[in-house]
Amino acid sequence: MLNPQLNRHGELIHLLSTEGLPRRIIEQILDLAATFVPAPGQEFPKLPLLHGKSVFNLFFENSTRTRTTFEIAAKRLSADVVNLNIAASSTSKGESLLDTIANLSAMQADLFVVRHGASGAPYLIAQHVAPHVHVINAGDGRHAHPTQALLDMYTIRHHKGDFNQLTVAIVGDVLHSRVARSDIHALTTLGVPEVRVVAPATLLPEGLAQMGVRVCTDMEEGLRDADVVIMLRLQNERMRGALLPSAHEYFKHYGLTQARLALARPDAIVMHPGPMNRGVEIASEVADSGQAVILDQVTFGIAVRMAAMSLVAGVRP
């Protein structure tokens, strides 16, 4: 089966999901990102790699961090950036998604960064753009968020070096989390021997065992001796029905406190894709501790998105 993310030479042309993404491509993105990360106290480099190219940020769902970091990344690569106000756009007036893409392509778009509430929307767009136009998925429904997963992998590699002896715990609302799915695919591809998914039964999707993870409904069991703890927020906006008694009850059983973190390895790192709900999935004492590398994730996210845009466009330093 052909991989829609790669051309016939096996080169990355769209970044749609970490599922099916070869290890060599993931490592290529991480290695290139490392060349973009500034030294402490320095700014991100300004490079001419996408000079003359137009990057269209199409966010059909609200976002602050992701849209902003994509915009910064594109500008650091000297691209022209267009941020489309979807709420005021023609899609809200009845124009189809593909008609919108066709019209924007006629404006000489070279790269679409797409966030959409419908799973698979970036795939659909990638199937209908011209060969010289590229698509990066910035999050689609519950399905995938590949650049978040890649910046998570970069953060883990930066702090832990190797993947092949790690135990990684992903904790929280896995049912609604595209980040969890993308992280699981990336972690297993990179050879992490034990990936644990920790959540109440009502927030666990079906089919996790087939993804090669260990499922835990007990927080203490899931955290014990973990090297990396990735916390997920409760996505109340995607919940239908009473999946949880209350946020207070959730924190009581699944919130990451200092006492619970002590079950992990002493040098464990704590990650979170943001935005954080302090006092719901994570205690402030943990979020503000030396073990939390959440702000590193934000910084590395710019470099990883610079790398992803460069590679899909077929350019590199």
Curated annotation (Swiss-Prot):
Top-level enzyme category: transferase
Pathway given in the UniProt record: Pyrimidine metabolism; UMP biosynthesis via de novo pathway; (S)-dihydroorotate from bicarbonate: step 2/3
Enzyme Commission identifier(s): 2.1.3.2
Residues bound to L-aspartate: K93, R178, R233
SUPFAM superfamilies: Aspartate/ornithine carbamoyltransferase
Protein purpose: Catalyzes the condensation of carbamoyl phosphate and aspartate to form carbamoyl aspartate and inorganic phosphate, the committed step in the de novo pyrimidine nucleotide biosynthesis pathway.
Protein name, entry field: Aspartate carbamoyltransferase catalytic subunit
Species this protein is from: Bordetella pertussis (strain Tohama I / ATCC BAA-589 / NCTC 13251)
GN (gene name): pyrB
